[in-house]
């Protein structure tokens, strides 16, 4: 069957089978309204109906419960302690001190956990918001210029942007494009304002010129990247704009399409995949290309099997060149050959850096992104105290850290003093710890199969011990990530060592990613315990320490030494 006939078959729907039930749900939702208002008025249950459980995602929320107490509540004949997690829409992760103080106050007064969670989507999450407080939450955010539209669901999610305050002018341009792309691809329905902000119900017909009345087949993620930093992990995303500068001025973007990390255990038709390079476009074509990629995926994506609905599978099904050609046609552009660039690092530069504008920026390492007042380490209070005096802004990073940006020289010492007094600067944190990351998982995530956030700190301590045992210096560390399920929020499928939760206390153990985030790791051992994993790491690090080439990273070593095969083409190699 030729590619052209294949595409026609796909478009006619004959290849893919009956539509998934989510398509019915979206079609009947009256542009994402559903019966959410009625559910909010139902105080008999703390949860939402089956359909609205899905629909609230388009409004930036997930229904969850506290899994630590689920069994005990069941014994008492009580329903699970339903609550919602909200993820804010913050393109590029920039938030003002005034906004920060407002979200800090809400988290303290109206969430079950009293914490703020910085996430790999370069924004913050509230966890444990009970139904009576949901509308208040949205109205509080709206009062400070924040919303949560389309941070979940089958839409374009929060747009990430490289956090690079040193290159202040270029960063500002890239950040502005991240905001423009976010606004351009945002749902146009008034449902959010009507439901949460008591907006006037207008007698108008909603239209979604880009997303369509059934929205996208699956979630869609976009980034704006300033090389050589790859802090946003381009290959975890559907659409990436790599900033190309000429004499310090942004002139256009290289466009990468079709990355993504989610998969399903036991389903070899699912796999993590790197994005394909489509080529360069000038700035004035950016929004046209963004819309063309989204609408092509909207029309060609798999709406029958949600496990194969993401852009990466569409590219592999129709062919990358065919997809690219359709984007060119819809955008009225011809991709030029990509301009040279290199991605070399992913970590945040923890500590102080000075920008070319003479202002100072303090990157704070926040382990797992969890801002909470721990005994002896009141991290959440510390950031609030900084916000009370800070004259610049805060920048949340895709590594779950926080940058205090735009600090004038005369305020630098005072900001550092506050940070140190509250444990936000800890000189004992190793480079290994700073290069380790986990998703939330238990107790709040309903998809978690194993611990991640609560597991990581102590396990990293054990990895630190292994590195020390083999006499490896501080700079020789390993990109280590844990995700509680195969959906990939912790981006373990771009790590040198990636653990993917399989069952309580058990993980699939992946090796072979690289430090720059441009290679997918391969499964080394399946469904093994953390003790078995540590034993394996000890043996592997021992070999790395004695057999490696000069400056050879751990992931590169595991491939050269034949410990795992390199994943070059995911569809062919990942499960081979």
Curated annotation (Swiss-Prot):
Keywords: 4Fe-4S, Amino-acid biosynthesis, Cysteine biosynthesis, Heme, Iron, Iron-sulfur, Metal-binding, NADP, Oxidoreductase
PROSITE patterns, sorted: NIR_SIR
EC number: 1.8.1.2
Cofactor binding note of this UniProt entry: Binds 1 siroheme per subunit. Binds 1 [4Fe-4S] cluster per subunit.
One cellular component (GO) term of this entry: sulfite reductase complex (NADPH)
GO biological process, one term: cysteine biosynthetic process
Any one GO molecular-function label of the UniProt entry: sulfite reductase (NADPH) activity
EC category: oxidoreductase
Involved pathway(s): Sulfur metabolism; hydrogen sulfide biosynthesis; hydrogen sulfide from sulfite (NADPH route): step 1/1
Residues holding siroheme: 489
Database matches in NCBIfam families: CysI, PRK13504.1
Family the entry assigns: Belongs to the nitrite and sulfite reductase 4Fe-4S domain family.
Subunit relationships: Alpha(8)-beta(8). The alpha component is a flavoprotein, the beta component is a hemoprotein.
Name by which UniProt lists this protein: Sulfite reductase [NADPH] hemoprotein beta-component
Gene (UniProt): cysI
């Amino acid at each position: 069957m030729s590619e052209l006939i294949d595409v026609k078959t796909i478009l006619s729907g004959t290849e893919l089978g009956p539509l998934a039930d989510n398509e019915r749900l979206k079609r009947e939702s009256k542009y994402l309204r559903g019966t959410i208002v009625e559910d909010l008025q139902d105080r008999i249950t703390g949860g939402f109906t089956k359909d609205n459980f899905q629909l609230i995602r388009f409004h930036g929320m997930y229904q969850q419960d506290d899994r630590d107490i689920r069994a005990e509540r069941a014994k008492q004949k009580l329903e699970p302690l339903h609550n919602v997690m909200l993820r804010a829409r913050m393109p590029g992760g920039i938030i003002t001190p005034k906004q920060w103080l407002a979200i800090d106050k809400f988290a303290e007064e109206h969430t079950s956990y009293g914490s703020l969670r910085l996430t790999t989507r370069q924004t913050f999450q509230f966890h444990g918001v009970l139904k009576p407080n949901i509308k208040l939450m949205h109205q509080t955010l709206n009062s400070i210029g924040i919303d949560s539209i389309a941070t979940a669901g089958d839409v374009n999610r929060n747009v990430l942007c490289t956090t690079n305050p040193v290159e202040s002018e270029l960063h500002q341009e890239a950040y502005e494009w991240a905001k423009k792309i976010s606004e351009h691809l945002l749902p146009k329905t008034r449902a959010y304002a009507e439901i949460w902000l008591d907006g006037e119900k207008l007698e108008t017909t909603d239209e979604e010129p880009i997303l369509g009345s059934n929205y996208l087949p699956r979630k869609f993620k976009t980034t704006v990247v300033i090389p050589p930093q790859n802090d946003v992990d381009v290959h975890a995303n559907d659409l990436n704009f790599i900033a190309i500068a000429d004499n310090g001025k942004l002139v256009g973007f290289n466009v990468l399409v079709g990355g993504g990390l989610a998969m399903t255990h036991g389903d070899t038709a699912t796999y993590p995949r790197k994005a394909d390079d489509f080529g360069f476009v000038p700035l004035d074509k950016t929004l046209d290309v963004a819309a063309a990629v989204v609408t092509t995926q909207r029309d060609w994506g798999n709406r029958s099997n949600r496990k194969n609905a993401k852009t990466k599978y569409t590219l592999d099904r129709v062919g990358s060149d065919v997809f690219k050609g359709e984007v060119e046609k819809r955008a009225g552009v011809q991709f030029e050959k990509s301009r040279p660039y290199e991605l070399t690092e992913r970590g945040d530069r923890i500590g102080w850096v000075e920008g070319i504008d003479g202002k100072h920026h303090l990157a704070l390492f926040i382990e797992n992104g969890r801002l909470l007042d721990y005994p002896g380490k009141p991290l959440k209070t510390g950031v609030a105290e900084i916000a009370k005096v800070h004259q610049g802004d805060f920048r949340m990073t895709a590594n779950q850290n926080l940058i205090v940006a735009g600090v004038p020289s005369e305020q630098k010492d005072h900001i550092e003093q506050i940070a140190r007094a509250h444990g936000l600067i800890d000189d004992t944190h190793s480079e290994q710890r700073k290069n380790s990351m986990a998703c939330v998982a238990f107790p709040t995530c309903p998809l978690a199969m194993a611990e991640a956030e609560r597991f990581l700190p102590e396990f990293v301590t054990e990895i630190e011990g292994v590195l020390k045992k083999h006499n490896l210096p501080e700079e020789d560390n390993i990109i280590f990530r844990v995700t509680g399920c195969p959906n990939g929020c912790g981006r373990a499928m771009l790590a040198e060592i990636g653990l993917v939760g399989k069952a309580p206390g058990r993980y699939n153990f992946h090796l072979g990613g690289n430090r720059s985030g441009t290679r997918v790791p391969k499964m080394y051992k399946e469904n093994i315990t953390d003790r078995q994993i540590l034993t394996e790491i000890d043996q592997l690090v021992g070999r790395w320490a004695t057999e490696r080439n000069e400056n050879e990273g751990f992931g590169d070593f595991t491939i050269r030494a034949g410990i795992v095969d390199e994943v070059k083409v995911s569809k062919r190699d990942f499960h081979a």
